[in-house]
């Protein structure tokens, strides 16, 4: 019965979303006559993402869920230019929810919270939010290069112990401020303590506190320079009484250039006690002492403007990750792909990843189908 209920929930979400290929406005402002409810607006959007991956290895299989998510937003207008806002994003493993037993990780739940935050937004004084949300690093650096299929192998987003905990991508219990002054956008965040995260080998990670600052500066209409500095204080403890305090630090810079139909971006990030050592080490040396990651992407969009074919974007990307400590780990990836935007919110990524790593990871071919609404 529980599995049937989960399956029906996923099917209902997909069916409801199929009526449009843009964000659905569930409730517009001034729709309700009650003066307390009239300032409220509600929206729903999402992305359904089946994915197929082929490579040499034991976990090579025909298909799985590539990151389906559903988003719910609310905006309550207090006065012109000032609103209370809320946002919730639910990640759903559709293969798990539908009981396709050979196409999902049986050790993970069928659903997970991606974001949950609220706050106040003001046209003059900026936006202040609290909860489970994107980090300053992701807003300024990581999100700029999060634009191809198998990305994120050298940015801080998810190469740490987990972006929900260490501040790399979507930290929980975070307070964030953002404001724009002409061509300059400033960001600042503070990370509150977070519950323990279970690591491999009976080890545990606990965030004590952290924070970050960053900016985007528009040098020209199509050229933006970004930078970010972040620090997280945390402990790693073993199964016994052994533990070590780490002051994790990661700083990055990015340049984004969008002349005409081009999208060009390059990022660089420095790490200290942030990326877990490869291979895994003891509690005292759990993280690589130093490291850096580089990413670059170049894509050109050809507008087709046909009823069922909107555009095609061939692209090329590269990244490299270097770690130094008790190990000297390196990973280089090159990506060649094509992104095709179809009608009714559908799009397709076809990508080949060429890999050269210390761990001898295989090359990967991936096909991702998106339905965005």
What label would you give each PLM region?
Residues 5-47:
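N-terminal periplasmic/intermembrane-space "pro-region" immediately following the signal or transit peptide
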């Amino acid at each position: 019965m529980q599995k049937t209920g989960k399956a029906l929930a996923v099917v209902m979400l997909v069916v409801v979303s199929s009526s449009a290929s843009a964000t659905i406005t569930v409730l517009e402002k001034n729709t309700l006559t009650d003066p307390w409810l009239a300032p409220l607006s509600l929206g729903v959007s999402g992305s359904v993402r089946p994915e197929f991956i082929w490579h040499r290895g034991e976990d090579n299989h025909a298909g799985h869920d590539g990151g389906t998510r559903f988003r719910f937003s609310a905006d309550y207008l207090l006065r012109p230019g000032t609103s209370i806002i809320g946002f919730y994003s639910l990640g759903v493993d559709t293969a798990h929810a539908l009981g396709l037993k050979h196409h999902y990780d049986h050790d993970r739940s069928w659903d997970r919270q991606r974001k949950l935050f609220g706050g106040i937004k003001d046209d003059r004084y900026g936006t202040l939010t609290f909860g489970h949300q994107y980090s300053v690093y992701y807003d300024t650096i990581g999100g700029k290069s999060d634009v191809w299929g198998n990305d994120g192998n050298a940015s801080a987003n998810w190469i740490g112990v987990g972006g929900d905990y260490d501040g790399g991508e979507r930290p929980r219990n975070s307070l964030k401020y953002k404001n724009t002054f002409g061509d300059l956008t400033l960001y600042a965040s503070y990370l509150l303590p977070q519950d323990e995260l279970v690591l491999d080998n009976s080890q545990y990670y606990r965030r004590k506190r952290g924070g970050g600052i960053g900016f985007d500066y528009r040098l020209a209409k199509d050229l933006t320079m970004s930078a970010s500095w972040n620090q997280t204080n945390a402990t790693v403890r073993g199964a016994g009484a052994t533990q070590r305090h780490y002051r994790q630090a990661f700083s990055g810079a990015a340049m984004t250039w969008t002349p005409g139909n081009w999208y060009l971006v390059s990022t660089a990030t420095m790490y200290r006690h942030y990326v877990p050592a490869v291979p895994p080490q003891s509690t005292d040396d759990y993280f690589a002492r130093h490291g850096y990651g580089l990413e670059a992407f170049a894509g050109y969009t050809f507008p087709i403007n046909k009823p069922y074919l909107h555009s095609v974007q061939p692209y090329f990307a590269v990244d490299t990750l270097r770690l130094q400590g008790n190990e000297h780990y390196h990973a280089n990836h090159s990506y060649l792909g094509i992104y095709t935007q179809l009608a009714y919110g559908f799009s397709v990524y076809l990508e080949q990843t060429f890999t050269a790593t210390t761990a001898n990871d295989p090359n990967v071919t991936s096909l991702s189908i998106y339905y965005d609404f």
